[in-house]
């Protein structure tokens, strides 16, 4: 074993996939501290990958259940933007292929902006179909945010290039004939819903950053329309824009 350099061992560990591989035992018996460090790093990496695979299996349980009932095109649907004082509510519907594996995909609120962007690209690459639904602030004011959220979800489903035969929806029942399941906190329990939430979140964040170029004083690129101190101070100084939800407190007080 000592005939192998540390670099040789590092390169070979890249090819080892099983902790029971005899090479791992050989490395563990190697007296060199640098080799011991490599083994520890490899074992940690394997444990992390195992945990992510187990998470993926758990988060595909609703999809497997639907497929066992004969459904094939299963769309996960979620929306973002219920709480902000400005900007649209955005929904996305995503149909993932049965064989895909996007490890680490989970509730978008638990992911960093960088990670969401990475998963956005992966989902767009892997998905069979992605649909987007957008409902602007003026409509939110007319029909309320709950109804606007449902409308955005329906629009997202209608925007899909393939027609789903089953829907997994985050905490909502939609006025559609399509078979569906409403799942509380679905973006943490279903990969399809998590994918929809990620696409919706990144899409909306990009929209708000673009709006910031037209309305730089409100800090939309940072607050995404939420009622931060900076945003409220801008509302007090400049009043609401066409992007603001006039029926939302405290926007009403600045009209």
From Swiss-Prot:
It catalyses: Endonucleolytic cleavage to 5'-phosphomonoester. Its EC number is 3.1.26.4. A divalent metal cation binds at residues 78-79, 170. One of its GO terms (biological process) is DNA replication, removal of RNA primer. Gene3D superfamilies: Ribonuclease H-like superfamily/Ribonuclease H. One of its GO terms (cellular component) is cytoplasm. Residues 72-255 form the RNase H type-2 domain. GO terms for molecular function: manganese ion binding; RNA binding; RNA-DNA hybrid ribonuclease activity. Its cofactor is Mn(2+); Mg(2+). PROSITE patterns: RNASE_H_2. Manganese or magnesium. Binds 1 divalent metal ion per monomer in the absence of substrate. May bind a second metal ion after substrate binding. The keyword Phosphoprotein does not apply. It is an enzyme of class 3 (hydrolase). Belongs to the RNase HII family. HAMAP family: RNase_HII_B. NCBIfam families: PRK00015.1-1, PRK00015.1-3. Endonuclease that specifically degrades the RNA of RNA-DNA hybrids. This is Ribonuclease HII. It comes from Bacillus subtilis (strain 168). The gene is rnhB.
């Amino acid at each position: 074993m000592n005939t192998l350099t540390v670099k040789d061992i590092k390169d070979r560990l890249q090819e080892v996939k099983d902790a029971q591989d005899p090479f791992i035992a050989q490395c563990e018996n190697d007296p060199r501290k640098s080799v011991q460090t490599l083994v520890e790093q490899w074992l940690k990496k394997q444990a992390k990958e195992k945990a992510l695979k187990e998470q993926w299996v758990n988060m595909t349980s609703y999809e497997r259940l639907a497929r066992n009932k004969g459904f094939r095109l299963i769309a996960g649907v979620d929306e973002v933007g219920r709480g902000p004082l400005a900007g649209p509510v955005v929904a996305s519907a995503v149909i993932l292929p049965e064989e895909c594996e996007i490890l680490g995909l989970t509730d978008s609120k638990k992911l960093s902006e960088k990670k969401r962007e990475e998963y956005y690209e992966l989902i767009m690459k892997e998905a069979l179909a992605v649909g987007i639904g957008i409902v602007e602030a003026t409509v939110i004011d007319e029909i309320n945010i709950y109804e606007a959220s449902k409308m955005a979800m329906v629009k997202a489903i209608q925007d899909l290039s393939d027609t789903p035969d089953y829907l997994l929806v985050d905490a909502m029942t939609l006025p559609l004939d399509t078979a569906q399941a409403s799942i509380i906190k679905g973006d943490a329990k279903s990969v399809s819903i998590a994918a929809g939430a990620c696409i919706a979140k990144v899409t909306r964040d990009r929209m708000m950053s673009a709006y910031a170029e037209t309305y730089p004083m409100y800090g939309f690129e940072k607050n995404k329309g939420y009622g931060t101190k900076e945003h409220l101070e801008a509302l007090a100084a400049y009043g609401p824009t066409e992007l603001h939800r006039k029926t939302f407190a405290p926007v009403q007080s600045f009209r």
